[in-house]
Amino acid sequence: MMQDVSSSPVSPADDSLSNSEEEPDRQQPPSGKRGGRKRRSSRRSAGGGAGPGGAAGGVGGGDEPGSPAQGKRGKKSAGCGGGAGGGGSSSGGGSPQSYEELQTQRVMANVRERQRTQSLNEAFAALRKIIPTLPSDKLSKIQTLKLAARYIDFLYQVLQSDELDSKMASCSYVAHERLSYAFSVWRMEGAWSMSASH
């Protein structure tokens, strides 16, 4: 009789233990067998140190038997935000430095571009002062360059011709005025209109 009594309390305890062991197994199917694999990998990573198993173990550790929905959320967050966070931690804070370096490079490139365009505009303004222009001229940069090339050609032709003598060359102001007038007349005759149309 004592054996029966002693065996009867043990058997319910064994049943309760077996039930308690079976209950997590029944509750784990929503998370699947992956949770068990991740737990095994987490044990391996805990014994072996850091590695890819450690990241999987961290996700597996979040899968509690009573909260399968939290496990799915943990997987989503690990897949989306965890990847970016892992990249930042693996680079050791290198990504903010690279972003700052990119920003400084962009700022320096913008400064250089502004300086280049400013110096280019100043050079074109000086060139427009030298080239005789008509009051109706609103020249673009390419038209200014074409007009400068025409003016150089015109000056070369004037120097080669015998129309201007040394008296005109003695006074630069008069020579410049006459050259400007002659160049304007030369432009009005159609020599510039053909090149400006292109």
UniProtKB/Swiss-Prot annotation:
Gene Ontology biological-process entries: cell differentiation; muscle organ development; negative regulation of DNA-templated transcription; rhythmic process
Location of the region described as Sufficient for transactivation activity in the Swiss-Prot/TrEMBL record: 157-187
Basic residues biased stretches: 34-43
Any Pfam family: HLH
Start-end of Low complexity biased regions: 1-18
The entry's keywords: Activator, Biological rhythms, Developmental protein, Differentiation, DNA-binding, Myogenesis, Nucleus, Repressor, Transcription, Transcription regulation
Gene Ontology cellular component terms for the protein in this record: nucleus
Compartment list: Nucleus
Matching SMART domains: HLH (SM00353)
UniProt biased composition (Gly residues): 46-64, 79-95
Principal location: nucleus
MF (Gene Ontology): DNA-binding transcription factor activity, RNA polymerase II-specific; protein dimerization activity; RNA polymerase II transcription regulatory region sequence-specific DNA binding
Lineage: superkingdom: Eukaryota
Record function comment: Acts as a transcriptional regulator. Inhibits myogenesis by sequestrating E proteins, inhibiting trans-activation by MEF2, and inhibiting DNA-binding by MYOD1 through physical interaction. This interaction probably involves the basic domains of both proteins. Also represses expression of pro-inflammatory cytokines such as TNFA and IL1B. Regulates cranial suture patterning and fusion. Activates transcription as a heterodimer with E proteins. Regulates gene expression differentially, depending on dimer composition.
Assembly mode: Efficient DNA binding requires dimerization with another bHLH protein. Homodimer or heterodimer with E proteins such as TCF3. ID1 binds preferentially to TCF3 but does not interact efficiently with TWIST1 so ID1 levels control the amount of TCF3 available to dimerize with TWIST and thus determine the type of dimer formed.
Protein name in the entry: Twist-related protein 1
Originating species: Eulemur fulvus fulvus
Lineage: Eukaryota, Metazoa, Chordata, Craniata, Vertebrata
Gene assigned in the entry: TWIST1
